[in-house]
Amino acid sequence: MTQNTSLSYRDAGVDIDAGDALVERIKPLAKKTLREGVLGGIGGFGALFEVPKRYKEPVLVSGTDGVGTKLRLAFDLNRHDTVGQDLVAMSVNDILVLGAESLFFLDYFACGKLDVDTAAAVVGGIAKGCELAGCALIGGETAEMPGMYPAGEYDLAGFAVGVVEKSKAIDGKASITPGDVVLGLASSGAHSNGYSLVRKIIERSKPDMNAKFDGERTLADVVMAPTRIYVKQVLATMQKVTIKGMAHITGGGLLENVPRVLPENTVAELEKAAWPRPKLFDWMQAEGNVAENEMHRVFNCGIGLVIVVAAADADAAMAELKAQGEAVYRIGKIRARSGDEAQTLVV
């Protein structure tokens, strides 16, 4: 090729036509997520959203996260339809902990070469997650960056904004007291955390990922199960019961996430026999010879969201959560802390 040859963006590795085709695939997916407050459609330089008028003193709550190395399994297994829901769940469940209703979500998809079908599958999962959370997929960015990512790989980031009435924002550190009850909502699996260890165990064990593992589900099905989104169910419960604190059980497991919402003078004492541990965690512990404490410091071990309520409200909270379709367990209690003991114990 001589210096006089005309170059195009496509010659440099960026396919504008593919990007345009993806936008057309995305538009109907995003449209399904529209809700009250969205002003305008996809394609503008920015997105407008009007805070619902029912809020007297609205406080905006924001969250951002990725999917971590679960993406590597998505590449290896060629399964791209669930990681989008994972992406949404990571942020909307985080802001839910503060009592926030999710309003809108934006995503960032980066790759070396854009594969429209793969990207559309990912965004389809994002749209499904937004529908489950009741928030609008209001915009996003698709970045095709030649030379930055290996062929067939991509990275994801997501951003959620929600709102809570100022007087109803949940602050566990200010309201949780000894005697309160700890409830646990079931997870759908490992969610989106601990996947570097998941992958290491798979690398060591070399299982048949397509063999039946849990009932009719294969191991691939189980490890790629999308993160459960708790938003609508918990918001409905908050209308009937006072929730004193919540913890989204992500990286760090129960042992490192529950203390984030506890007053310094309290301990959450959890009973591991109080909830059923999904087969995946027992398999990983056995195949990886993982210590029990490490399991609870890395994985959710079957509990995706922890809710703390007053003892007098525990039965009502459990009944309402069950009515909303959640599997909920009474997994422990809050007690006074002795000295500098750990703030969360799994016994």
UniProtKB/Swiss-Prot annotation:
GO terms for cellular component: cytosol. It catalyses: 2-formamido-N(1)-(5-O-phospho-beta-D-ribosyl)acetamidine + ATP = 5-amino-1-(5-phospho-beta-D-ribosyl)imidazole + ADP + phosphate + H(+). GO terms for biological process: 'de novo' IMP biosynthetic process; adenine biosynthetic process. Its main location: cytoplasm. It comes from the Bacteria. Its EC number is 6.3.3.1. Keywords: ATP-binding, Cytoplasm, Ligase, Nucleotide-binding, Purine biosynthesis. InterPro entries: PurM-like_C_dom, PurM-like_C_sf, PurM-like_N, PurM-like_N_sf, PurM_cligase. It is found in: Cytoplasm. SUPFAM superfamilies: PurM C-terminal domain-like, PurM N-terminal domain-like. The keyword ATP-binding applies. It holds the Pfam family AIRS_C. One of its GO terms (molecular function) is phosphoribosylamine-glycine ligase activity. Belongs to the AIR synthase family. HAMAP family: AIRS. This is Phosphoribosylformylglycinamidine cyclo-ligase. It comes from Dechloromonas aromatica (strain RCB).
